[in-house]
């Protein structure tokens, strides 16, 4: 089961948030799709995903995307994605 919590943070406060969930088993091959789906729900740009992001998610069950991880200009300090299905 996949359940992810997406939080857009600005000045250490949650500005927007959403959760996505799927009944399928979590796979890192689909990690980009999960991120895209959550960003679409938040009406936010989708970040570039590098190996560092996947490794942090695997190790700590959450990942932070900073404005430098986005191609487009974003108006927030970070996008946090947390795994709720541990």
Identify the meaning behind each predicted range.
Residues 14-42:
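Short, flexible N-terminal segments of the mature chain
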Residues 1-21:
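Short, extreme N-terminal segment that most often corresponds to the first beta-strand
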Residues 34-86:
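Acidic, low-complexity intrinsically disordered segments
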């Amino acid at each position: 089961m996949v359940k992810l919590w997406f939080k857009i943070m600005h000045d250490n406060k949650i500005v927007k948030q959403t959760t996505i969930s799927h009944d399928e088993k979590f796979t890192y091959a689909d990690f980009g799709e999960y991120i895209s789906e959550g960003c679409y729900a938040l009406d936010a740009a989708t970040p570039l995903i590098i190996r560092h992001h996947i490794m942090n998610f695997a190790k700590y069950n959450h990942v932070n995307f900073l404005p430098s991880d986005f191609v487009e200009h974003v108006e927030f300090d970070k996008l946090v994605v947390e795994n709720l299905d541990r």
